[in-house]
Amino acid sequence: DLWQFGQMILKETGKIPFPYYGAYGCYCGWGGRGGKPKAGTDRCCYVHDCCYGKLTSCPKTDDRYSYSWLDGTIVCGEDDPCKELCECDKKIAVCFRENLGTYNKKYRYHLKSCKKADKPC
């Protein structure tokens, strides 16, 4: 669910998720707007959208899953029916951390150059 997802992002990046990533670039935020991803951070969101699109179990983004932290690493519950969803959220949280250096405030609320998707997943 969004709360769990936000907690992963906060712990991985130290950033409060909504103001930082809620409307960033062409893909960060509810349902990407399309176009070419804006640098690494926005690419994380593009990949996350694709990951959600490929879910075969627990396709609702508001479903809860089990996860824990082990030595600073997110571990998704092995037998959880929503493990795929957890793995998608884990990947983007880690991607955000790895791409903190690509974050550019000029891409917040940046809609002008975002068009229909031109990159298939």
From Swiss-Prot:
PROSITE patterns: PA2_ASP, PA2_HIS
Cysteine pairs bridged by disulfides in the record: C26-C114, C28-C45, C44-C95, C50-C121, C51-C88, C58-C82, C76-C86
This protein's UniProt keywords: Calcium, Disulfide bond, Hydrolase, Lipid degradation, Lipid metabolism, Metal-binding, Myotoxin, Neurotoxin, Presynaptic neurotoxin, Secreted, Toxin
Organism superkingdom: Eukaryota
Molecular function per GO: calcium ion binding; calcium-dependent phospholipase A2 activity; phospholipase A2 activity; phospholipid binding; toxin activity
Active site: H48, D89
Entries under Pfam families matching the protein: Phospholip_A2_1
Official protein name in the record: Basic phospholipase A2 BmjeTX-I
Lineage, top ranks: Eukaryota, Metazoa, Chordata, Craniata, Vertebrata
